[in-house]
From Swiss-Prot:
GO MF assignments: rRNA binding; structural constituent of ribosome
GO biological process, one term: translation
Stated role: Binds to the 23S rRNA.
PANTHER family assigned: 50S RIBOSOMAL PROTEIN L15 (PTHR12934), LARGE RIBOSOMAL SUBUNIT PROTEIN UL15M (PTHR12934:SF11)
Source lineage: Bacteria, Pseudomonadati, Pseudomonadota, Gammaproteobacteria, Moraxellales
Pfam families reported in the protein's UniProt record: Ribosomal_L27A
TM ranges: none
Organism: Acinetobacter baylyi (strain ATCC 33305 / BD413 / ADP1)
Protein name stated in the entry: Large ribosomal subunit protein uL15
């Protein structure tokens, strides 16, 4: 017997039918449909919003705000060392990274981190590097220009 993709089916009894709520007492979930009797949770759009604690001041309102989101970090792309291999040519700059679709067009800065391996020598211009990434590029015969 050969198995064909169009003949695949779950085993007999493996799948259970969906519960049809409010369809008679014989179904076991008729009338109130498993919602109990009255109350907010029994209504159509019943339930409380996320974070609601029954009327007491919620934790997100009791605790102070702190910190901030750096706008520079939002515009800085993190580039893996292995992604530099996608760049055509010897020079790696923000423009060449964008041209190779390694960095999004709206990014203003890029930072190369040590992840993966570099297969050829590159000259890195105007891109920040971690110490490990810089050592790996120089070990592969490349150089870093600020």
């Amino acid at each position: 017997m050969t198995l064909r993709l169009n003949e695949l089916a779950p085993a007999e009894g493996a799948k259970r039918d969906n519960r049809r709520l409010g369809r008679g007492i014989g179904s076991g979930v008729g009338k109130t449909g498993g919602r109990g009797v009255k109350g907010q949770k029994s209504r159509k759009s019943g339930g409380v919003r996320p974070g609601f604690e029954g009327g007491q001041t919620a934790i997100y309102r009791r605790l102070p705000k702190f910190g901030f989101t750096s706008q520079i970090a939002l515009k800085t792309a993190e580039v893996r060392l292995s992604e530099l291999n996608k760049v055509e040519g010897e020079i790696v700059s923000l423009e060449t990274l964008k041209a190779a679709n390694v960095v999004r067009r709206d990014q203003v800065r890029a930072r190369v981190v040590l992840s993966g391996e570099v297969t050829r020598a590159f000259t890195v211009q105007g891109v920040a590097l971690t110490k490990g990434a810089q050592a790996a590029i120089e070990a592969a015969g490349g150089k870093v220009e600020e």
